[in-house]
Amino acid sequence: GYGPGNGGGTGYSLGNRKALNKPQPEYTCQEQGRVAVQVTVDRNGNTISVTAGVQGTTNTAKCLLDQAKIAAQNTKWQADSNAPEKQVGKIIYTFSLN
């Protein structure tokens, strides 16, 4: 990426499961704000679908949504054999210009 800012994760929720590997989104534009991404995760801890720009998002610039989506898709979660087959959670990324 390029630009003076950085993308930082501020939080996530998926029941009581932890994110094992949570890549940071790349910063590719002069935009800042919060992007909330809804994630659907299988019992093995794989993110199987993502929707960027859900409730909690403060900036819907395409460059932020796209990067948040990529980071969310690559997030690996704790496996949980007792979890629902498809568990829905949320990750919130905060993009800020330095």
Sequence positions of predicted segments:
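A short, well-structured alpha-helical segment
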Residues: 13-14, 30-36, 40-86
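Short, low-complexity, Pro/Ser/Thr/Gly-rich segments in the mature regions of secreted, periplasmic
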Residues: 90-98
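Acidic, low-complexity proline/glycine/alanine-rich linker and hinge segments
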Residues: 1-28, 66-74
